[in-house]
């Protein structure tokens, strides 16, 4: 997990003994990914690259973390991330994704979560079988334990209403959620995409939203099919006065402890890349 540092609210500068930036001891990563929907009762078509994308999301983080800051070479800053949860296909059940236990191997143990699978108008779609189904924002209180970020590699997670209103029931301590208003598609360039995301956010010290938007512009669906496009988005939790918005934080300015964000949604940002489909 991550250790505490102090964020100076006026200067937005991190104070750490012997180093102007504090390094997290570790980032615990968890993934839920579904390719084989037939094993989950069907109801929708199978996918081809989501399990691989989940693996690449973790291993790309492992390649750049530790040593995220420009002040340190990659691999010199702290312990490597842990892959605390790797649920695939039939393992991605309603009970698994909604479980609020913060013990190892559960969703709320993980600092950063990844979901790769079908989305359906601001909900997760796990399959038509018993024990799967549609997971609504009210079913998945994010951040009751250690979860602080979520990246959804799925269609329409910010479609179907105003994101800050629709996702309000899910924000229970999470800082920010990344996803798409548009359709998203299987992408066999997920290593390049997620490596670009982690490098942008950590080593290049871009904001969370720009790290995601730029990675999608370079290696998202438009890169494979130039006539198409994407609309990625970032939804932040409400932030206290004099604090930078969580979607606009570079990783070096993140408060590296377990303190939950305010249990309210804040600003939503999006970017149209090419010609998205909805």
Residue ranges and their predicted role:
Residues 18-22:
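Sec/Tat signal peptide C-region and signal peptidase I cleavage site
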Residues 34-39, 117-123, 154-161, 181-188:
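Solvent-exposed loop/turn segments at secondary-structure junctions
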Residues 23-115, 119:
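A domain-level signal for caspase-like cysteine endopeptidase catalytic cores
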Residues 156-278:
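Active-site-proximal C-terminal subdomain of hydrolase catalytic domains
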Residues 1-7:
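Bacterial N-terminal signal peptides that target proteins for export
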Residues 9-16:
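Bacterial N-terminal signal peptides
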Residues 94-110, 131-145, 164-173:
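Mature extracellular/periplasmic domains of secretome proteins
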Residues 119-149, 156:
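A short, glycine/acidic-enriched catalytic loop
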């Amino acid at each position: 997990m991550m250790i505490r540092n102090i964020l100076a609210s006026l200067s937005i500068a991190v104070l750490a003994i012997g180093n102007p930036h504090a390094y997290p001891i570790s980032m615990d990563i968890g993934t839920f990914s579904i390719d084989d929907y037939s094993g989950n009762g069907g109801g929708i078509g199978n996918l081809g690259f989501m399990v691989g994308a989940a693996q690449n999301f973790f291993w790309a983080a492992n390649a750049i973390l530790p040593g995220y800051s420009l002040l340190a070479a990659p691999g010199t800053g702290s312990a490597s991330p842990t892959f605390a949860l790797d649920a695939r296909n039939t393992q991605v059940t309603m009970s698994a994704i909604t479980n609020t236990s913060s013990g190892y191997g559960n969703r709320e143990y993980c600092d950063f979560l990844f979901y790769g699978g079908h989305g359906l108008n601001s909900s997760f779609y796990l399959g038509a079988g018993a024990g799967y189904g549609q997971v609504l924002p009210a079913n998945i209180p994010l951040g009751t334990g250690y979860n602080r970020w979520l990246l959804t590699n799925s269609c329409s997670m910010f479609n179907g209403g105003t994101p800050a209103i629709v996702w309000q029931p899910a924000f229970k301590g999470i800082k920010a959620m990344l996803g798409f208003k548009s359709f998203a598609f299987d992408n066999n360039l997920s290593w390049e995409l997620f490596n670009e995301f982690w490098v942008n956010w950590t080593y290049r010290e871009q904001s969370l939203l720009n790290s995601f938007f730029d990675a999608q512009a370079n290696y998202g669906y438009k890169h494979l099919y130039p006539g198409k496009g994407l609309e990625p988005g970032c939804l932040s939790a409400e932030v206290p006065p004099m604090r930078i918005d969580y979607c606009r934080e570079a990783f070096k300015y993140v408060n590296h402890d377990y303190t939950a964000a305010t249990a309210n949604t804040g600003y939503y940002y999006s970017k149209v890349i090419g010609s998205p489909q909805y």
